[in-house]
Amino acid sequence: MNEQAVLAPWPEHERTSSVLFNNVPCAVLVPFIKNAGGLDLLFEVRSKTLRWQPGDISFPGGKIEARDVTPLAAAIRETGEELNIPPEKIRVLASLAPLETVTGVTLNPFVAEVSSVEDIRCTAEVDHTFTVPLQWFMEHEPELAEMDLATRPGATFPVDIPYAGNPMEWRRRKTYFVYIYRYEGYRIWGMTAQIVKECIDIIKAM
């Protein structure tokens, strides 16, 4: 692995707008940290008191707000708000193609080098942070697990319209796969793992 190539600007990837209606635009930072042992990826564990995905592992980021000039601005702002990392400690390396989630989110990932972890202070949204050596990801393939996308009638669905099957049961519409990395008791999965997998594929091709 060529660490100098990893920390140089990455090739541009085509960015396209969402093809789904009513998606929530979000942005995340994918932070690389250089230390004596090599390069690490920084992750955060979401607070267990949050209503949305409590305790999940993610990259710093969140919803793109009206005050954000660009998706990148949102990723940097959210990183500062969640981990107290100032913009001057962030050097952007690449913007990856947006990802569409089945939960109605368009996720804009930005790869960056964070020059120091001394400033990291977790806010109420973050339980704690941890790092994983980049080399570990280079040497370990993720697991693949099936997820079912399903629907059932809501409370206001008209009773005079027939619905096949038990209205209280979920009806499977589509099966898709998610990546899972297991590292020292941590389970990195879903969109976060998909972003990691894309980064590793790009780095291996450098």
Language model: regions and residue ranges:
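N-terminal leader/linker segments that precede catalytic domains of diphosphate-processing enzymes
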Residues: 1-58, 63-109, 113-118, 126, ...
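Flexible glycine-rich active-site/ligand-binding loops centered on an Asp-His dyad
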Residues: 129-131
